Every structure is written in C-alpha cells, then in structure tokens.
C-alpha cells in the first residue's frame, strides 16, 4: 500500500494542509505553516486529526483532487 503525505492548500494564506495516507488509506489530516513541522512522524502526530470514517464520496473527491494536481505528494516521514 501507499504510505504518503499529501500537501494541499490551507484554510488561510500562509497555511497548508496535509493528508496522511497509510497502506493506501486516508488515516488523518491536519494543518501547518512551516515546512519543518511536517519533517518527522513525531511532529506530524502532534498536528494530525484522525479520520474515523472515510466515505465513498471522500475517496472520489480525493481521486478528483489528484487528477487536478491539487496535492503535492511526498514520502511519509519515518
């Protein structure tokens, strides 16, 4: 499965959002302002908000967002 960190737009200028994909499944999301805040798994864990229920609509939206290049995909930090 894919283990990735997806980087996207934040809620306001200067902020970015992230999605954590583990084994091909969306497990959490969060927001950050500075790149160093997402450089380690430990730091990500402090910012992440767990996703409990991923509906088919969310999966579809994520696929569409990928097609539109709305996310930058990085390797998930260890």
Each model region followed by its residue ranges:
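Conserved catalytic/ligand-binding micro-motifs in nucleotide and anionic cofactor chemistry
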Residues: 1-78
């Amino acid at each position: 499965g894919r283990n990735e960190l997806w980087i996207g737009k934040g809620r306001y200028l200067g902020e970015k959002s992230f999605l954590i994909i583990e084994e091909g499944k969306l497990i959490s999301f969060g927001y950050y302002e500075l790149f160093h805040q997402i450089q380690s798994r430990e730091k990500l864990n402090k910012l992440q908000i767990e996703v409990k229920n991923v509906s088919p609509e969310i999966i579809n939206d994520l696929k569409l967002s990928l097609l539109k290049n709305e996310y930058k995909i990085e390797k998930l930090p260890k």
